[in-house]
């Protein structure tokens, strides 16, 4: 195990002091968050409910430690452990008053959460087979442990522009996560010397890319110097203004590979002169019996529920048995399961019996069903668009009932993510799905399909083969697997074996996937069949504005991204879709959310064409689209030109949501009015209370202007707040009225992130809130 940092005790004490101050309102939420997040403690979707993320380098934890984690979770009120896609474990559903106790008890067990969140070096990934893979160059685990011990103790590991992710691969033929991390290290042996092939700048999140090959071979002794140099390089060159463009890959996008490598070389050369080496030997464990077995203990979506006491008792017995066998007998995996390893042949039957007793159905199911990975999605993530867990469950059920021989899929990877942020890593899978919004006469949940990532040989992201309604995805998956099984049968007659991933990486596999996707492209209109307009796991008709948004600005830009991506998808294929998404793309910046296509075109005409931001030459095109809809015949060049004009305008938008003419970037654009509600919004907006004029929450502070935002959903309420602030002078005070719940939880915090001062927020007797904001 890695070495616990010496400062951990005082860090935990400081956490406790800040938590008490926060509870007593003597410490601000911002100050508390700034400390607790790098300590690996996050607030969950429900206010004042917390999660502690335990660092488990390489997924390593001893059976005795995991038993202790279960005890700690239970005794502190948690009902759930969660295994993450970085092979670590979280304790969820904690009250703040119990978190310090959790951290202290974890420390006593040789575990820590420090560095589990924020702009830090996150949990380091190592292949789950490292140390037991007969084809590995060498076991990378001791190097990851030694590196973790150094990094969690260094202050500059907590001051970076954004998080840094590191991954090791022990087998030179299986690059895996080393190909998509900020620093990827693939074990190699050359001329008897150990070293690493080094990739830099990879990332599977938004604007994804595989890493750039920095070193074909780097001696293991240079490992510390490399990572130290990367921290210094990142601190000096990372983007601290825009967290959405702050990861290392954005430096490559900005400067190009050659210039970026030159800068890294400078820092690397300086660190090599210091000649500091990692103490790897302290972390080497005796080699286990090479004849030992490995078994996967599956957990659906990585969840280890603690409420079923009978099952939990079986898990405790299993962990106790593993403790008798040895300490290196389990690892968390990036597929959110536990891999049992180094199981002697004479104990294998005992271990398998307990694993099966814990969850017989999961233990006996085909491996592919245990390998479906999903982000939390819109049911718990405030940035989510689609209910990704609902879709994952639907895929799971459809495959399970298909009657197909799923054993032929071996350990195929299927990944689902609910929005373009790509937290579920769909572009690093055999078959991936990315949630988005599409429209007919009504919005509906959809998924862009990706196939064929190469995580085995040379790193390569999956490629898109189409976009279909969420409703059709399970049937698409079953049809795709049927086709694969047919192809596998043909291959078998020719004496060859084909994996699901290899097939989807082939041109023939991609072509088959694209052809099957085309069968499911069209859906009926809403008035003809409402089923495709419901998301999986939801009983309400799909609507983007129903999704919660934690950071209002993030939600705003996410909605813009949906339309921007839809424009790119539709170019050359569907001119009406290009016109529709171009017209809708920037309406959110004016606090508008029309519920039908006619409303979109009317609002675009009023707020962008008539306001002078977009040329009036596009008016006939907009009127045609409004009148003829998807059945019309449109000039492709005009549709594309409109989209280009809207995207160019978006690039001129400043932090106050004001636009400048793309043709004359220096000229002032027309002043945007605070958004006028559409006719539909006027109907929905509640009538003012008997005392129509909002009253100040602080009689000593008189507002310059007041705005009633009750009944306005997130992020529209934030947009309207920004637009109001844009018309005020620095130091002026804006008073807004917000509903209880998400509006008061989200808007003040997002306003603070913009640099404005929230003077006060007070809940009124009627239940709504009055908030005073001083413009920066």
Task: Please place each PLM-identified region on the residue numbering.
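Alpha-helical protein-protein interaction scaffolds
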Residues: 568-577
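Peripheral terminal and linker regions in Fe-S/redox and tRNA-modifying enzymes
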Residues: 1-568, 669-686
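Long, charged low-complexity segments
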Residues: 554-569, 583-673
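Core SAM-dependent methyltransferase catalytic element
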Residues: 770-776
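A glycine-rich helix N-cap at a beta->alpha junction
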Residues: 108, 754-764
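Amphipathic alpha-helical interaction surfaces in cytosolic regulatory modules
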Residues: 716-723, 740-756
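An N-terminal amphipathic alpha-helical segment
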Residues: 695-728
